[in-house]
Regions:
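Short, intrinsically disordered/low-complexity patches at protein termini
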Residues: 39-42, 50-53, 94-95, 154-157
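A short helix-loop-beta-strand connector motif used in the catalytic cores of GNAT acetyltransferases and
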Residues: 48-61
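Short, contiguous strand/loop micro-motifs
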Residues: 28, 33, 51-52, 94-95, ...
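Hydrophobic, helix-prone linear segments
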Residues: 8-9, 45, 49
Length: 196
């Protein structure tokens, strides 16, 4: 059973997503267009995405095991023929530590398995190290675009890279191996402490 599940974004999700769009860290790390948009304009935009724009972009709701909303993922720049898209996500502040990484994995898994996307375009603003360390960001990026985004009064540099299905699986396998190594070290340390 998956730790985070993905479901379709609905009208009931709009107020929660608008609150996320207005959150300060979200604005600094992704986009701050919500600062200059009214609630009515933001609501209309979300409803338009739900009703009319599924061929070019989609919003997904990320849920904890009990069904509560922990965040959202959205895909843009969809090319159905080439099976590519850009994936973005935002986790609600109170769930970032507990669900952040699992939410990202769930979103990637969903768009690959359910929407048949083979290549995902990733964009992360260079200062945003909430999920990817600065070193990993430098290693992954293929394009570095200075002055890419203007958020909360500053020009931001963006890093872009693509990730195929095979590359994503290798990353997941490496994470699983690291978790196993850590668990084994903890077990070994606990066994030594118990024997003493």
């Amino acid at each position: 059973m998956s730790f985070v599940t993905v479901r379709h974004f609905t009208e009931d999700d709009v107020p929660t997503r608008i609150a996320l769009l207005r959150e300060s860290r979200f604005q600094a790390n992704l986009t701050d267009f919500a600062v200059v948009s009214s609630d009515d304009d933001l609501t209309a935009g979300q409803f338009r995405t739900i009703a009319e724009e599924h061929d070019t972009k989609r919003i997904l709701t990320l849920c904890a095991p009990g069904g509560e909303t922990v965040g959202f993922a959205w895909i843009t720049s969809i090319d159905w023929r080439a099976q590519t898209c850009e994936l973005s996500f935002g986790v609600l502040p109170r769930y970032r530590g507990a669900f952040g990484a699992k939410a990202v994995i769930a979103a990637h898994t969903h768009i690959r398995r359910e929407l048949n996307m083979r290549v995902v375009i990733n964009q992360v603003l260079e200062h945003n190290t909430m999920l990817v360390s600065a070193g990993d960001l430098t290693d992954r990026r293929r394009v570095r675009c200075a002055y890419d985004s203007y958020t909360v009064g500053e020009w931001r540099t963006a890093c872009y890279w693509t990730e195929t299905q095979e590359e994503a699986q290798r990353t997941l396998d490496a994470l699983d191996e690291r978790r196993r190594e850590i668990a084994e070290r903890i077990r070994a340390t606990s066994a030594k402490a118990s024997a003493s």
